[in-house]
Swiss-Prot record:
HAMAP family according to UniProt: PlsY
Source organism phylogeny: Bacteria, Bacillati, Bacillota, Bacilli, Bacillales
Source organism of the structure: Bacillus cereus (strain ATCC 10987 / NRS 248)
Principal location: membrane
Family of this protein: Belongs to the PlsY family.
Gene Ontology BP term (one): phospholipid biosynthetic process
EC number annotated for this UniProt entry: 2.3.1.275
Gene name linked to the record: plsY1
A Pfam family the protein falls into: G3P_acyltransf
Protein name: Glycerol-3-phosphate acyltransferase 1
Length: 182
């Protein structure tokens, strides 16, 4: 059961997820809304396409750090891996469906990666190895990336996380795969 402090943390995590690095950077540097540029997605990939590698890196890092902050603080305050995974889900929902942008946010990959590294760097390293294998097979980033992300629940089981934590990780994967289905 979630107590009131945890509930408030989840709400704060969702709202923190509403901070979209791509939006802030393009407003600050170019006085435009990235949601009206390129693919219209306020994420690292669109930033890279429209403004170049530097903007991709800044956006990726900003959104990844956002996920890592939420996960790290949840771990510090509550110490329960199931709750930490729930906090990661909350920040992802805030990033993907931000209330301040009428539900039109990013696709969550950068935030997920940052949160996952903070959650368990060994799982993150395992998934990097899986990605490299699939990258060598498919010679691209999108398909190997999505296949790798789908391997998270298997890693959760291999690294002995609870069934509830593993199910939450599977829900996160379903969300990310749904948002990235195009």
């Amino acid at each position: 059961m979630i107590n009131s402090m945890q509930f408030l943390y989840l709400v704060a995590s969702y709202l923190f997820g509403n901070i979209l690095t791509a939006y802030i950077v393009t407003k600050w540097r170019h006085d435009v809304d990235i949601r009206n540029e390129g693919s219209g997605n306020p994420g690292a990939r669109n930033m890279g396409r429209v403004y170049g590698k530097g903007y991709f890196i800044v956006t990726f890092l900003g959104d990844a750090i956002k996920g890592a902050i939420v996960v790290s603080i949840a771990e510090y305050l509550f110490g329960d891996s199931t709750f930490v995974m729930l906090a990661l889900l909350a920040v992802l929902l805030g990033h993907i469906y931000p209330i301040v942008f009428k539900g039109k946010g990013g696709k969550g990959i950068s935030t997920f990666i940052g949160g996952l590294i903070a959650f368990d760097y060994l799982i993150a390293l395992t998934l990097v190895a899986v990605f490299i294998i699939f990258y060598l097979i498919f010679k691209g980033f999108t398909k190997p990336g999505l296949i790798t992300i789908a391997c998270l629940p298997v890693c959760m089981i291999l690294y002995s996380y609870s069934i509830v934590t593993t199910i939450l990780s599977a829900l996160i994967i379903v969300l990310i795969l749904y948002v990235n289905r195009d």
